[in-house]
């Protein structure tokens, strides 16, 4: 499992555990409020990717959950099942069609990808240039650009609506834009520990990276 794959499948995680941002009013303040007030959440997502030539890949949809610090589940239900789940120490990607599970340590898997914002182990400003964007589609936006030229992506735009994340748009190093729309967000539910526990199904290949 590459960091690039994780950054796509866990795009919701970009919003979950970011360090508080002492920035200007607008999307930055809303993200700060979300981080301060929301310790866990569940919701639904739709995800689509458009290539540099305008070619659109099949849309995905599913559900997500997260809990600070560092736990999340990103479950693709359609058109094909796929699961990325973190227990805070390990990240697992399960692909039923391939009958394969890939396992990495959280730090190794996330590295300097956008999902590093999820874990909030350091100062966001040290890893990203963060700036406000003009309002668009009735949402307030911010942009984070990696300071590391080898991050594998160019920028990630995050849209906020009423102190809740509404959309993520990731531009990768290949010129592809992945858009994730979030809905039905429930803030601060009580989530059982088993929500972020993963055991590989019998008979599948387990690859440890």
From Swiss-Prot:
Location in the cell: Periplasm
SUPFAM superfamilies linked: Prokaryotic lipoproteins and lipoprotein localization factors
Entry-linked InterPro entries: LolA/LolB/LppX, OM_lipoprot_carrier_LolA-like, OM_lipoprot_carrier_LolA_Pbac
CDD domains recorded: LolA
Coiled-coil annotated spans: none
Keywords from the named record: Chaperone, Periplasm, Protein transport, Signal, Transport
NCBIfam families per UniProt: lolA (TIGR00547), PRK00031.1-3 (NF000661)
Family annotation (HAMAP family): LolA
UniProt subunit comment: Monomer.
Purpose: Participates in the translocation of lipoproteins from the inner membrane to the outer membrane. Only forms a complex with a lipoprotein if the residue after the N-terminal Cys is not an aspartate (The Asp acts as a targeting signal to indicate that the lipoprotein should stay in the inner membrane).
Family membership noted in the UniProt record: Belongs to the LolA family.
UniProt-recorded name of the protein: Outer-membrane lipoprotein carrier protein
Organism of provenance: Bordetella avium (strain 197N)
Gene that encodes the chain: lolA
């Amino acid at each position: 499992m590459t960091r690039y794959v994780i950054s796509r499948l866990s795009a919701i995680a970009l919003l979950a555990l970011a360090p508080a941002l002492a920035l200007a009013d607008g999307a930055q303040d809303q993200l700060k409020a979300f981080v301060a007030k929301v310790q866990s959440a569940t919701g639904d997502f739709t995800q689509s990717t458009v290539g540099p030539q305008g070619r659109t890949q099949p849309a995905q949809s599913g559900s997500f959950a997260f809990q600070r610090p560092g736990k999340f589940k990103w479950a693709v239900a359609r058109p094909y099942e796929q699961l990325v789940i973190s227990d805070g120490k390990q990240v697992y990607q399960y692909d039923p069609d391939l009958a394969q599970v890939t396992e990495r340590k959280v730090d190794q898997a996330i590295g300097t990808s956008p999902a590093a914002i999820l874990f909030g182990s350091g100062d966001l400003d040290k890893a990203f240039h963060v700036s406000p964007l003009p309002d668009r589609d009735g949402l307030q936006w911010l942009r984070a650009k990696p300071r590391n030229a080898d991050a594998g992506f160019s920028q990630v735009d995050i849209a906020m609506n009423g102190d809740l994340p509404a959309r993520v748009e990731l531009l990768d190093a290949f010129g592809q834009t992945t858009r994730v729309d979030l809905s039905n967000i429930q803030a601060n539910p009580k989530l059982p520990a088993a929500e972020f526990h993963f055991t590989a199904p019998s008979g599948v290949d387990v690859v440890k990276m």
